[in-house]
A protein has these predicted regions:
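Conserved glycine-rich Rossmann-like NAD(P)H-binding loop of the short-chain dehydrogenase/reductase
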Residues: 26-34
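Glycine-rich Rossmann NAD(P)(H)-binding loop
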Residues: 7, 173, 197-203, 229-237, ...
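Conserved Rossmann-fold NAD(P)-dependent oxidoreductase catalytic core, especially the SDR/UDP-sugar
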Residues: 83-148, 164
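N-terminal Rossmann NAD(P)H-binding glycine-rich loop of SDR-like oxidoreductase domains
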Residues: 4-24
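Conserved beta-loop-beta element that borders a ligand/cofactor-binding pocket
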Residues: 150-175
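Substrate-positioning beta->alpha
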Residues: 179-184, 197-221
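NAD(P)H-binding glycine-rich loop region in Rossmannoid oxidoreductase-like domains
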Residues: 35-97, 103-106
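Mid/C-terminal beta-alpha module of Rossmann-like enzyme folds, strongest
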Residues: 216-276, 302, 311-353
């Protein structure tokens, strides 16, 4: 039975990867600091929790033991993290290091954490220029996240070991934080009958389902190598299409009001607003043999059900307060009252599920 060791295995990506590997007959050890955070479904499926601190090399080496067929690092944020991973990777058949679309820059040097949004004219391939590496900035900051990821990537890619760097887009699934779909789920639960969307709901920010990441990681496990791979969903729905998907899954009907530039600033915003599409090219992963687990609609459904069930039990997402900017009902109602039934500032469609 092949063995996998997942560093940071109780989080979004680790949970999905562990479940997929367990279903495929792997022995999976999930490394984390707090056993109380071990998802119950992983334990039920046969996963084993190993208590260790990712920052403690002695503990992670003990967790690896005599080696693993697959090593997955969901917590590699800096060059120092990457260097501490190398002794583990040297005793693993295939290693996956999670990275991000945040490393990419457009022709003007802008990136997804820039004050000015980037403009990528075409889907982003793995050979697109990246930010310069940095080790002297906080990886938890907007300015430091991408440069530190680049520095970490360079360490593992130059090691000569079979390490695959996986650059994900905006991730979603059970356990995602932030759970961006809450901006729409909450609106449904509140019984809103009208949905206002800025930029006519045309914003596109490519998503990456944790289930699709897990599928790619399993593919890499059987095809070790030193490479960089993008990972994103097989479709890239717009903000309008995402809202329709969520409302449809929850059986909710509302009128859509698609706002143009004459509408008040800030009205109709969603977490997927972007003046220019941000889409990853995933043809390299496909060529390797990756087959996604599903589209956005099919992979987001379990997370939607989990959000609704938790809300009905009185449990909101931990970061629910950060979504208030998308749920300004008073401003929406005032705009609709001023509109007086006309379509000034936008146009309406019929009810959508």
């Amino acid at each position: 039975m092949p063995r996998a060791l997942i560093l940071g295995g109780t989080g979004l990506v680790g949970r999905a990867t562990a479940l997929r590997l367990l279903e495929s007959g792997w022995r999976v050890d999930v490394v984390g600091r707090d056993p109380d955070r071990m998802p119950a479904e992983l334990t039920a499926a046969g996963g084993k929790f190993v208590e260790a601190d990712r920052a403690d090399q002695a503990q992670t080496r003990a967790a690896l033991g005599s080696g693993a067929d697959l090593l997955v690092d969901c917590l590699c944020f800096t060059a120092a993290d990457a260097r501490s991973l190398l002794p583990l990777a040297a005793n693993s058949g295939s290693t996956v290091v999670m990275s991000s679309r945040a490393v990419y820059v457009d022709a003007a040097g802008r990136h997804v954490n820039s004050d000015v949004p980037p403009h990528f004219a075409t889907p982003i391939t793995e050979d697109r220029p990246t930010l310069a590496p940095a080790t002297d900035t906080d990886h938890r900051s907007r300015e430091g996240y991408g440069p530190n990821k680049v520095a970490a990537e360079q360490v593992v890619l130059e090691s000569g070991l079979p390490v695959s760097v996986v650059r994900a887009s905006r991730m979603h699934g059970i356990g995602a934080s932030p759970a961006r779909e809450w901006a729409v789920v909450k609106r449904v639960l509140d019984g809103r009958t009208i949905l206002l969307l800025a930029r006519r709901g045309a914003g596109i920010v490519h998503g990456t389902a944790a289930a699709n990441l897990a599928a790619l990681i399993e593919t890499i496990a059987h095809r070790p190598g030193t490479r960089v791979l993008n990972c994103a969903d097989p479709d890239a729905p717009s903000a309008l299409e995402i809202c329709r998907t969520i409302a449809g899954h929850l059986g909710h009907v509302w009128e859509e009001v698609l706002l143009d530039d004459t509408a008040p600033a800030g009205l109709g915003r969603t977490p997927w607003d972007s003046p220019h599409p941000i889409v990853l090219d995933t043809s390299a992963a496909t060529a390797l043999g990756h087959r996604p687990a599903g589209t956005y609609a099919t992979t987001i459904a379990p997370a939607l059900d989990r959000l609704v069930d938790a809300a009905r039990r009185g449990r909101r997402p931990a970061d629910a307060d950060s979504f208030t900017e998308y749920l300004d009902y008073a401003a929406e109602d005032a705009f609709l009252a001023r509109r007086g039934g006309s379509l000034t500032g936008g146009s309406a469609t019929g009810p959508r599920r």
